[in-house]
Amino acid sequence: ETTLRNIEWTPTRFGEIAPVGVFDSVEIDGCSVSRATLHNLTFIKELELVPGCRISVSKRNMIIPHIEENLERGHYVDAVPPVCPCCGSQTRIYQRKGNDGRLIETVHCDNPNCDSQIRKRFTHFVGKKAMNIEGLSETTLEKFLTLGYLQTFPDIYHLNEHQEEILQLEGFFLMFI
């Protein structure tokens, strides 16, 4: 049992703005836990989750933190972010059928130029499940995107054109193997 302190909203690479519950740290199975996915808007509405409510938290499959229930229902106030927390574009609620046939509501940012979405698309592209390019962390990608070295995926393969500038950045050096 703990207190939900905040709901953070973060855009995914597809534009869905994913909610995460931040709560007072609790120990479950020897691990300190203070965050759990809230999945979608439907989950938040069904549990009537609002900051300040008392919640019950468990671990699913002995690993994944999960908010099981709201112990103080009846105080729900719709708190959908009106704008994307990253780019400020207006949000939209989408409805789709879940695997069980129930209607699921999700919050989306429809801005294709949202920095967070772009960064996450690049992070996925270089990741193990896609191109498996080692050495390009999300932080490095964000730096290269900000500096304009990356605009499209093929730009990754032409970073050598910016070698002199990159070597001037803190933490970058030339390595010979």
Predicted features by range, described:
Residues 1-177:
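RNA/tRNA-interacting regions in translation and RNA-turnover enzymes
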